[in-house]
Amino acid sequence: MRKSLFFLFVVMLALFAGQAHAQRCLPKMKGIRLTAGMADGFYAKSASNNTGYTFGASLATYTKGGHQWVLGAEYLRRYHPYRESRIPTEQFTGEGGFFLGVLSDGSKTFFLSAGVSALAGYETVNGGRKLLFDGSTLCNKDGFLYGGAVTLQAETYLTDRLVLLLYGRERCLWGGSTERFHAQYGVGLKIMLD
């Protein structure tokens, strides 16, 4: 009986080792962020021709005070209704920004950050094809984009290495021939590297 209790104790120590909550968001810690979200509205079956979606990947590096530098890439696809069909607009952007730690709890499990980012990339409308299915010609052009984004992000630690993200952001981009502003919201995971 004693051997089994000792074995159970050793297993419990192994399972709960590495649970020091104070070792989070230290300077030079890095994490890979993977995000997915909706753009320019909420998805509904009746509005499926107007919806858009985003995917992103980035590297976050922490500084003093729990602030972060973020460097990454994002893909946004937005649809515009046209007769019985829809015309896709795609944006491929790179991002560099700073996220200021606004709020955190005492156990370092929950964080709220506000960020500002610079964006640059490329936009294509209808895959670069000017002629539509009914013979009409698109006047929109493909082109390079530049601008910025403001982000509000909530993070909660699921484990010491896995973080759940919830975010909302507004992008403002010039240079394209379609909409300038894009509101986004979504979820993501951050995998802490060290």
Regions found by a protein language model. Give the residues of each.
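Extracytoplasmic loops and strand-loop junctions of Gram-negative outer membrane beta-barrel proteins
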Residues: 38-42, 79-81, 133-138, 169-172
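Extended low-complexity acidic/polar segments
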Residues: 93, 102, 132-167
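Gram-negative (and chloroplast) outer-membrane scaffold detector with strong preference
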Residues: 58-133, 162, 191-194
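Solvent-exposed loop/turn segments connecting transmembrane beta-strands
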Residues: 42-52, 65, 82-86, 174-182
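Short glycine/proline- and aromatic-enriched beta-strand/turn motifs that initiate or cap beta-hairpins
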Residues: 21-72, 190-194
